[in-house]
A protein has these predicted regions:
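Auxiliary alpha/beta "docking" domains used to position bulky ligands
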Residues: 1-163
Length: 163
């Protein structure tokens, strides 16, 4: 297992796998502004009926609690725009709703990234909790947009989306 990889090697392999952006950030507690933003959002019930968003606040604020020993967060972006679109005269739907579930596609590519970087040799050989990494795609209590910003993938607009 390779425990020390350069950012350029990771980015090059991510690009080879089809990710159009990749960046890294040091795994650490979020800054005080982000912590206040999360607390206000929860107090104002910004999560509506998504009760799971109010759980595991400590983990959301410090990703090292999600994976013991975590040192780096690798954030990626993948364009899931379909190759074939619905004709304009037919009812439309969001691109992410086309075809295969993006969670599955991104997760598969992230496991391939780990394998190709020598972090993971056989996805079926060991339990995920035994790995030196953790793959998450909207499925863990982590502030994805914050970490994508920290990794240099964009900035957050007024709509709270990463641009």
């Amino acid at each position: 297992m390779n425990s020390r990889l350069s950012n350029s090697v990771i980015k090059a392999e991510a690009q080879r796998l089809g990710f159009f952006a990749c960046g890294m950030a040091r795994a650490q507690k979020v800054d005080s502004t982000e912590e206040r933003n999360l607390e206000q959002w929860l107090e104002q019930k910004g999560h509506a009926d998504m009760q799971y968003m109010a759980k595991h606040k400590e983990v959301r604020l410090d990703p090292r609690l999600l994976l013991n020993g975590a040192k780096t967060i690798v954030s990626v972006a993948l364009n899931y725009c379909p190759k074939v679109t619905i004709p304009q005269d037919e009812p439309q739907m969001a691109y992410y709703a086309y075809g295969l579930d993006y969670h599955d596609i991104v997760k598969q590519k992230l496991y391939a990234l780990a394998c190709n970087l020598g972090l993971h040799t056989d996805p079926k050989a060991a339990r995920p909790e035994d790995q030196p990494f953790r793959v998450v795609v909207d499925t863990a209590p982590i502030l994805e947009r914050y970490w994508a910003r920290q990794a240099g993938l964009g900035w957050q607009g007024k709509n709270r989306q990463l641009i």
